[in-house]
Regions:
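Acidic, divalent-metal-binding catalytic cores of TOPRIM
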Residues: 1-208
């Protein structure tokens, strides 16, 4: 459905797109498979659509991101995955209105996600940088998820208490990582500047 919504605007009398996904569970999946298929001259009329993960952000700094970004008929998201777009903050109020038939605005999604993003940004940098360096053991995806998960959400005051609780958890983990891996602090700062040039800011981290 996501990629259909992308390509619908480009259909014409000359161009038509048919979106298909593997139907059998035994079909091979993954980026290596896509890259192998993309080299086949018999599928030159096929566009391969994938989640970026970090390949867009890494900007040719890893072998896979180089290959993905230089293959002309591979489309990938700027965000980590298509699901990130479903959480696009400016759209969430309208989704609630459609679901509840009630337009009362009791929660500012845009402010909350900006505040949430600023809160988790330090740990996002640790995880993304360690992933680019192929040192995921320093701060694994499981550790990152556990560190930024919201165990409760206070609707009143737009999640103020929730974010305060999360901020304390993030600060503790960030401090522990700084003490354990002090040699990564300066390179990580330069890495953050590269991410900024790719569109990542402390306020929109939730998309990536």
């Amino acid at each position: 459905a996501f990629w259909r919504s992308v390509f619908d605007d480009y259909e014409s009398d000359e161009f038509m797109f048919e979106i298909s996904v593997p139907l059998r569970n035994d079909l091979a999946k993954g980026k290596k498979v896509v890259l192998h298929l993309a080299e086949d001259p018999e599928v030159r009329d096929t566009l391969f659509c994938i989640d970026s993960d970090f390949d867009y952000l890494f900007a040719d700094q890893t072998p896979v991101s180089r290959e993905i970004n230089r293959t002309p008929h591979i489309f990938h998201t700027y965000a980590y995955a298509t699901e990130n777009y479903l959480c696009y903050a400016p759209s969430l109020h309208n989704i609630c209105v459609k679901a509840t038939k009630n337009d009362t605005n009791i929660f500012d999604f845009e402010k909350f996600f900006a505040d949430y993003s600023r809160t988790i940004y330090p740990l996002f940098l640790w995880y993304a940088y360690s992933a680019q360096q192929e040192s995921e053991h320093i701060f694994t995806l499981a550790d990152f998820r556990a560190s930024v998960r919201l165990n409760f959400l206070e609707i009143e005051h737009n999640g103020l208490r929730t974010l305060a609780w999360l901020r304390r958890n993030v600060a503790r983990r960030d401090q522990a990582l700084r003490e354990r891996h002090a040699e990564m602090i300066e390179p990580k700062r330069a890495f953050a500047e590269k991410l900024f040039r790719r569109g990542v800011t402390p306020e929109n981290t939730y998309l990536f």
